[in-house]
Amino acid sequence: MIETKRLKIYAASEKQMETFIAAQSVDVLKAAYTEMLDGCLAHPDRWEWYAIWMIELKDGTHIGELCFKGIDESGSAEIGYGISDDYQGRGYASEAVTAAVAWALKQEKINCVTAEVDKDNVASIRVLEKLGFKPTGRIGEEGPIYRKAK
């Protein structure tokens, strides 16, 4: 578990992920979260790198999720994150991503963390730039790719 001033961030258990997936009403999210659970089950020794990470306030209120999308052969881990609409604009994304990226960059096999963001998602781009992520000049399926190295 990662704790910040206002947040608790932790990799969900198999049961928590199953419950979370079952509650999803958006098919594309349900499929993505199912793929994460499949990654966890296929790589139990690297659970954190495939799991849904829950973002909660200190009182246990669930406000969002983040995830790493595995580790590639170069030691790069992609992060994805989202904060529920009711909690946006309060710095929670910056706080959660700062803590998660700091944790990731302390891990032995990690050289950098990347994030792919929709070009129109100005708030998410601001979060990444504020945290020292730099554009790579590459465009992924969702949009520009940003990178932060050790």
Predicted regions and their residues:
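GNAT-family acyltransferases
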Residues: 1-78, 83-86, 99-103, 107, ...
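Glycine-rich acyl-CoA binding loop
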Residues: 91-94
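Conserved beta-strand-loop-alpha-helix junction that forms the acyl-donor binding cleft
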Residues: 115-125
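Conserved active-site tyrosine of GNAT-family acetyltransferases
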Residues: 128
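Conserved GNAT acetyl-CoA-binding A-motif
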Residues: 107-116
